[in-house]
Every structure is written in structure tokens, then in C-alpha cells.
């Protein structure tokens, strides 16, 4: 079991889809919480064309060793052919907050 926490960023097609996906991850204890940001503007290259789309984004706080399970969930419930899921290390956090994240997520 790892005591390292991280932030996992996921984008989705809209706020409703992403809120439901976040709720599922929190309910199943894959994430302690998720802060959803709606109406972000994404500009990216896809299949040879430049796309300009409105999306939603969530920042999940979780254990580092749960990231593969979150990636697997995103791959199995995808709104996109190539879902955006990235994990960023948390270099430092308030000790009480880090303990809370660990307590609210399931140990592997």
C-alpha cells in the first residue's frame, strides 16, 4: 500500500457526464474527491484536423497506486476514443488533508 497521493486530471464531453463519472469513482473509493471545472475550451489535433471544443475537466485526489484502476475505468466507460487521463504527483500537502485522502480511498 502506498501513502503517496496524486491528482488525476480527466476531461469529458460535458459537466453531467463528468459529474456522474466522478461520483462513481468517489462512491467506489477510487478517489477521495473530485473538483469539476465546467466549460473549458480545448483546442487539439484529431484525425488530421484542428478541433475546438467545449469540455469539462475534473481534478481527482487519490492514492498513487489507484491510478491504474482509474485509467481502466476511463478506458471502459469512455466518451472519447482516446480519453485524457493524466496523473500528477502531489509533492507536498497539508498533513491532515493527505491523511483524509488516504482514509477515504481504498488501500490496494
Question: Which residues does each PLM region occupy?
Answer:
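Positively charged, small/polar-rich N-terminal and surface patches that mediate targeting and assembly
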Residues: 1-108
